[in-house]
């Protein structure tokens, strides 16, 4: 739990850097603290030579899929490949643990991130209305075994994202 507190403080400072974009984030962390304690939700710290450059949060949602709740790279560390490298490492870890899918959502206007997902072969399969941000977000999925079972992907997306609708 000490490690979680340190990471939680780091997320608070990250939230302060994005003030206005993620004002609800530290409250969300506190509300979901139990899921961090039981291991269904994990925060990874992104490092470069021991220096924290950002964070990634994963929610192990079901036996079949994990939901990447966010990849946050400090503004002064962006556009250096940290998010992409972290995603690649997490996808390998999920595959080794026999997960089928990794889901992620991002703001529609975040074209750079959508391009990164597509370059890693995520499929943008629909949208989710984000009730806190009051806007639609893209929902993308990575099929770890490349089976391309879109019916299953859509069904799982509906379970993970209450406001999900297909493209």
Where are these regions (language model features)?
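Conserved acetyl-CoA pyrophosphate-binding loop and the N-cap/start of the following alpha-helix
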Residues: 77, 81-89
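Conserved GNAT acetyl-CoA-binding A-motif
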Residues: 94-106
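Conserved catalytic-core motifs of GNAT/GCN5-like acyltransferases
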Residues: 105-106, 121-139
């Amino acid at each position: 739990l000490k490690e979680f507190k340190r990471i939680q403080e780091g997320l608070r400072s990250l939230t302060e850097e994005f003030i206005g974009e993620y004002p609800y984030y530290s409250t969300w962390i506190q509300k979901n603290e139990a899921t961090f304690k039981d291991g269904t939700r994990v925060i990874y710290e992104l490092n470069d030579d021991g220096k924290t450059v950002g964070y990634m949060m994963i929610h192990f949602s079901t036996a079949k899929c994990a939901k990447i709740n966010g990849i946050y790279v400090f503004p002064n560390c962006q556009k250096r490949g940290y998010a992409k490298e972290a995603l690649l490492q997490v996808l390998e870890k999920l595959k080794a643990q026999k997960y089928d899918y990794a889901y992620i959502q991002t703001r529609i206007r975040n074209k750079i991130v959508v391009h990164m997902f597509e370059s890693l072969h995520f499929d943008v399969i629909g949208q989710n209305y984000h009730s806190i941000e009051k806007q639609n977000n893209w929902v993308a999925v990575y099929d770890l075994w490349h089976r391309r079972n879109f019916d299953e992907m859509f069904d799982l997306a509906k379970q993970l994202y209450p406001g999900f609708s297909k493209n």
